[in-house]
């Protein structure tokens, strides 16, 4: 019996919608990263993008445990000397709720061209509405 190596043209990418309301940040991010990589499929091949499209709704209602809401820090840099900015979870979720989950999932994906292609298949929305009804996404219970 030979090992199956998936070809990019043979892979089908399904669409799933995930409701993040009340879910824990890290636990949800690991499940999403696994689906984006395609590790749940039998045809998983490390050098081929075999993952699915994931649409996340209610990103503003994601939860963290303990004191992470005040203690967890997020950094960004402008590119100029001394241009580092710092914010915490509470401020970031109020200003850009999609960025919290995006940063968590992006850190769990491989770095390089394949990882960049995988993160593009993640669609994040703060509310319940999303413009991907035409793709008929299936409900994914995580």
UniProtKB/Swiss-Prot annotation:
Signal sequence interval, chain numbering: none
Stored Gene3D superfamilies: Ribosomal protein L13
Biological processes annotated in GO: negative regulation of translation; translation
A Pfam entry, by short name: Ribosomal_L13
Gene Ontology cellular component annotations, sorted alphabetically: cytosolic large ribosomal subunit
Keywords annotated in UniProt: Ribonucleoprotein, Ribosomal protein
Domain of life: Bacteria
A single GO molecular function term of this UniProt record: mRNA binding
Function, in words: This protein is one of the early assembly proteins of the 50S ribosomal subunit, although it is not seen to bind rRNA by itself. It is important during the early stages of 50S assembly.
Quaternary context: Part of the 50S ribosomal subunit.
Family named by the database record: Belongs to the universal ribosomal protein uL13 family.
Annotated protein name in UniProt: Large ribosomal subunit protein uL13
Organism, as annotated: Psychrobacter arcticus (strain DSM 17307 / VKM B-2377 / 273-4)
